[in-house]
């Protein structure tokens, strides 16, 4: 009632990042050779509240390609077509592929993360696999409309136990502990399953 409404023509990059897959794609758009949103355009500065950290460090056996590796990251494994937020650690022998890893998460030695969104302060144990198998079509049992394209989502401060194996379209609730995986035989979480925090 009575308020003025104004429109503005915008020809720049825009994407609705509400759906999980759209958020994932928007982040991975940034690692392209000519990204639709140029983070290095000096005429369009990004003002952020990120804390000061040391530069990213790549170890002697590290390999990072087609990726954004933020300040404070330490990479001793392989990172491909991924976005690493500040403070992420990728340990020796670990592989991160087609994934978004948020603030201060640790990917343990020999772990594999493939096609995932991992929230901040998560620990992925040694030798664990997040996003395994070829079945990208079986939707998540709890979020079938949101997780049905092969992306596995891990919530904030979750702890994935060493040797665990999570399929595609899995959902790991925030603050899940290793003992919350006890109901899965041999720590294998099938595609489309959810890991809940014990009450």
Q: What are the residue ranges of the model-derived segments?
A:
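Left-handed beta-helix
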Residues: 1-199
């Amino acid at each position: 009632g009575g308020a003025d409404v104004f429109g503005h023509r915008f020809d720049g990059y825009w994407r609705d990042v509400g759906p999980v897959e759209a958020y994932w794609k928007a982040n991975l758009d940034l690692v392209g050779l000519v990204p639709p949103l140029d983070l290095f355009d000096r005429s369009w500065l990004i003002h952020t509240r990120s804390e000061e950290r040391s530069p990213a460090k790549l170890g002697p056996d590290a390999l990072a390609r087609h990726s954004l590796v933020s300040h404070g990251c330490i990479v001793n494994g392989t990172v491909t077509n991924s976005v690493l937020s500040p403070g992420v650690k990728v340990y020796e022998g670990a592989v991160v592929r087609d994934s978004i890893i948020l603030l201060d998460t640790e990917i343990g030695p020999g772990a594999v993360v493939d096609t995932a969104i991992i929230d901040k302060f998560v620990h992925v144990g040694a030798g664990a696999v997040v996003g395994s198998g070829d079945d990208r079509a079986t939707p998540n049992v709890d979020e079938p409309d949101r997780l049905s394209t092969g992306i596995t989502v891990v919530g904030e401060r979750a702890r994935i136990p060493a040797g665990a194996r999570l399929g595609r379209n899995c959902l790991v609730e925030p603050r899940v502990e290793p003992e919350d995986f006890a109901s899965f035989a041999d720590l294998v979480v099938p595609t489309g399953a959810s890991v809940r925090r014990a009450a």
